A protein has these predicted regions:
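Gly/Lys-enriched N-terminal cap/neck module of very large, oligomeric protein machines
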Residues: 2-170
Length: 170
């Protein structure tokens, strides 16, 4: 199973519909400061059930909605869709692809969907239980974790990377 596509619409700095196509294996998001790298990771964690606005670097959950600029109006909603593929075995579903999405509106409404059908946070959490995928996951390396890893010794670093890449130590 792997995350095949991230579709972001109105989430933080992503006012326009943005689609990121991913390939199997390890993916790194790189770019200059302020280009939205952390917002991509925040979007993933948000769909997977992050409930703390502070963990998403905001004061309230409405802070994930694009707030506008001098030249663009604020948007009324934010939506992110994560599409996973090759997931029949890991998720125990009959589907090769599973799309999980979350939508929030300025009036406080928040909805989850699994394959476009209304779902609860509990359903999303249950879907990914025991897969290593979730709002808190070793699959994502957030700001600050790089420094933490670099301060470990070589053996500890190897273990960390093996865990993240699902490789077994020799």
């Amino acid at each position: 199973m792997y995350l095949k596509q991230i579709e972001i619409r109105g989430f933080k700095s992503f006012a326009d519909r943005t689609v990121l196509e991913l390939q199997p294996g390890m993916t790194a998001v790189v770019g200059p400061n302020g280009c939205g790298k952390s917002n991509i990771v925040d979007a993933i964690r948000w769909v997977l059930g992050e409930q703390s606005a502070k963990a998403l670097r905001g004061a309230s959950m409405q802070d994930v909605i694009f707030e506008g600029t001098d030249t663009r109006k604020a948007l009324p909603t934010s939506e992110v869709v994560l599409t996973f593929t090759d997931c029949e075995k890991e998720l125990g579903t009959a589907f090769n692809e599973v799309a999980v999405s979350r939508r929030v509106s300025r009036d406080g409404g928040s909805d989850y969907f699994i394959n476009s059908k209304s779902a609860r946070l509990k359903d999303v959490q249950r879907l990914f239980a025991n897969t290593g995928v979730g709002r808190v996951s070793y699959s994502f390396m957030l700001q600050g974790q790089i420094d933490q890893i670099l301060s470990t010794n070589a053996s500890e670093r190897r273990t960390i990377f093996e865990e993240r890449s699902e490789k077994k130590p020799k």
